[in-house]
């Protein structure tokens, strides 16, 4: 179960790092980058939620 937690955390970390380019472009006025950023943030929210659920499940299993 711990492997799944680490995998989900790494996925979350990569996604957040990939947001940086579009976030900077959006701050400079690029509206398309803003759309991509918001879409990626929704994915971040989902992955973070899944990570919390997996963490709780792992705690209960111990």
Predicted regions and their residues:
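A structural signal for well-ordered alpha-helices, especially hydrophobic packing surfaces
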Residues: 16, 20-23, 45-48, 52-55
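A charge-rich, low-complexity, intrinsically flexible signal that marks solvent-exposed coils, linkers
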Residues: 15, 33, 55-56, 60
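Short, surface-exposed loop/turn segments at secondary-structure junctions
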Residues: 27-35
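N-terminal acidic leader/helix
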Residues: 1-22
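Short, charged, amphipathic alpha-helical segments
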Residues: 34-42
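Intrinsically disordered, compositionally biased charged tails
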Residues: 1, 60-62
